[in-house]
UniProtKB/Swiss-Prot annotation:
It comes from Callicarpa dichotoma (Purple beautyberry). Pfam families: RuBisCO_large, RuBisCO_large_N. The lineage of its organism: Eukaryota, Viridiplantae, Streptophyta, Embryophyta, Tracheophyta. Mg(2+) binds at residues 167, 169-170. The record marks 300 as: Transition state stabilizer. This is Ribulose bisphosphate carboxylase large chain. The gene is rbcL.
Length: 445
């Protein structure tokens, strides 16, 4: 069975048992009345069952309801069908004030019907020939308004300065100021020039997201013809059907696939309604993607540390034990489905590098947009500053130093040998994003 943990807030007067049963029925075989055609099938075989209910500590009239769904309810290899059933009409149910899908346990038999990520972590490292450190990226800014030639210039400067990747922002598609084909050509020219000058393999996430699947595939095919290593997709706004289609193409044609999660906070930010990002992350690993944005803990975007590390492990590891202290409701076995590299991006700069290296480890992409292009000396010095900071943190970690305790000292030491890093530290030394997270863990029993 597929197991689901729902946070249920019933309407006043509705007992939790009735609410849990209603969720199970509405998201599987049930409807609002008994129908004659119930007798033409075996409902006991197909109906969802609410098998356990527990109150949420510290919350009045809020419960975690566990529901089991028979596997025969779902089409093989289709995240679209799985979500249509589990989070379809039930979220508008009048008997509930609010409903949130906290987690899913995907059985191994169902996991094996999915291709998953086109390549996975180890294959990506082998393609890039880069080991033993996080990868460095940069989102080109301003995100909208640059001409294709100026956009390509920024890509070149960042890659030449020492970054591994540059990135289209999520809303860069094919606008009047920069049509997609022009952007692809100038970005490809930039990364090949940077590769020749640095001797390193470089990449730029060319956003293939489009208004139709046919147009999306046309862009991905053109990227492959240019010989670039990676393309990008906005998987929530683009949709799971489009994403899975693109992931299959990327595996067949040797392209890495970077995934942006634009629109996720509409779905996952509120604690009592919607669904958590850990569910969206599991769905992405099934649908397919080699990278996905996963928050930073320390930057400008929402993300509590324990929650973030919980779904980072769900993305990367082959087997994850149940751990309610990190928001993980079920043990999950991925049966060798390739892992996904988490991307830390949003309001981060060189002073965050020790914390990011300590939190995410080696298998991550640390992506500095404003933290590269906002350098007072220009784009290339901004990239140099980030690369020096990263190399200093990795060296210090490998020497056994405590990045959490000595991070500022490590960055200051490195800045003595890098004027670019010293200038970056001076510009961003006072920049912090200290706000309480909205989505937090429940208190322990």
């Amino acid at each position: 069975d597929i197991l689901a943990a729902f946070r249920v807030t019933p309407q006043p007067g509705v007992p939790p048992e009735e609410a849990g049963a209603a969720v199970a029925a509405e998201s599987s075989t049930g409807t609002w009345t008994t129908v004659w055609t119930d007798g033409l099938t075996s409902l006991d075989r197909y109906k969802g069952r609410c098998y356990h209910i527990e109150p949420v500590l510290g919350e009045k009239d809020q419960y975690i309801c566990y529901v089991a769904y028979p596997l025969d309810l779902f089409e093989e290899g289709s995240v679209t069908n799985m979500f249509t059933s589990i989070v379809g009409n039930v979220f508008g149910f009048k008997a509930l004030r609010a409903l949130r899908l906290e987690d899913l346990r995907i059985p191994t038999a169902y996991v094996k019907t999915f291709q998953g990520p086109p390549h996975g972590i180890q294959v990506e490292r082998d393609k890039l020939n880069k080991y033993g450190r996080p990868l460095l990226g940069c989102t080109i800014k301003p995100k909208l308004g640059l001409s294709a030639k100026n956009y390509g210039r920024a890509v070149y400067e960042c890659l030449r300065g020492g970054l591994d990747f540059t990135k289209d922002d999520e809303n860069v598609n094919s606008q009047p100021f920069m049509r997609w084909r022009d952007x692809f050509l100038f970005c490809a020219e930039a990364l090949y020039k940077a590769q020749c000058e640095t001797g390193e393999i470089k990449g730029h996430y060319l956003n293939a997201t489009a208004g139709t699947c046919e147009e999306m595939m046309k862009r991905a095919i053109f990227a492959r013809e240019l010989g670039v290593p990676i393309v990008m997709h906005d998987y929530l706004t683009g949709g799971f059907t489009a994403n899975t289609t693109l992931a299959h193409y990327c595996r067949d044609n040797g392209l890495l696939l970077h995934i942006h999660r634009a629109m996720h906070a509409v779905i996952d930010r509120q604690k009592n309604h919607g669904m958590t990002f850990r569910v969206l992350a599991k769905a992405l690993r099934m649908s397919g993607g080699d990278h996905i944005h996963a928050g930073t803990v320390v930057g400008k975007l929402e993300g509590e540390r324990d929650i973030t590390l919980g779904f980072v492990d769900l993305l990367r590891d082959d087997f994850i034990e149940k751990d309610r202290s990190r928001g993980i409701y079920f043990t999950q076995d991925w049966v060798s489905l390739p892992g996904v590299i988490p991307v830390a991006s949003g309001g981060i700069h060189v002073x965050h590098m020790p914390a990011l290296t300590e939190i995410f480890g080696d298998d991550a992409v640390l992506q500095f947009g404003g933290g590269t292009l906002g350098h007072p000396w220009g784009n290339a010095p901004g990239a140099v500053a980030n690369r020096v900071a990263l190399e200093a943190c990795v060296k210090a970690r490998n020497e056994g130093r405590d990045l959490a305790a000595e991070g500022n000292v490590i960055i200051r030491e490195x800045s003595k040998w890098s004027p670019e890093l010293a200038a970056a530290c001076e510009v961003w030394k006072e920049i912090k994003f200290e706000f309480k997270a909205v989505d937090t863990l429940d208190p322990e029993k």
